[in-house]
């Protein structure tokens, strides 16, 4: 059985079904601003990419299949390639290579905390590195199949961890780590709530990925970074399962939640999170402001933030980003910097 993958380009960002060719204006902008060559370079198709052979032995595959079932373990090149890294510029450039590429040696799709614990123990005994995988949108190398002293690497796909629970009294939601951001918001909206976390990777990233990377989003000015929304989390390690943050607050000193938030999966596998949510706002007011330059814009936005009770979205683009945004909209632009604000309420 094929291992499920998110509907995203294997060698780029976005859903391939929604891809559009670059306009002449954007192509000209890339040439002038970045020195991009006028010639198109043929990249390999997914069928032309060559991967280094899997280092998993038949015994390794059998041990993993004994935990999750043979249909939830794959060493097929297509499954390995789609989990070979994230979506940084370096990741995507590597995918253009016609030389043999590195990739995890296998993909394992567990369905419970117990299965993850057993997988970690199997891999520990067999010296197999484990890389947790959610939506595949990392831009900091968190998904690289680094072997080091290990004989092989497996990608631990968490897409089956998609449970949702809502405590309306405490305004907290318990979400599975493999739940994609859009699906989480859709399910919460059915009950009149939202998480309100919208990073640029939102369409493909998962709840666990938000936590493992300490994600920030466009609403972070109002609701805080993702780690500020976390009230509790469950982590599976080779030594057992940790349920952290059982109470809303604690007077204890060290907070073990901080060890795993932003850890990129290095210390354990996050499988569920309890998160602060809020009612969907009745009103949203969108406003845009222009400033002569970035310094003046930054001074104005700093004053707004220091006053308190500011907008949910408070974003200032520098001169270059403002110019590119104008070009993408087919506008010539008039220079300066653009600020976007969103106010929410009843």
Residue ranges and their predicted role:
Residues 64, 123, 240, 341:
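Residue-level signal for inorganic ion chemistry
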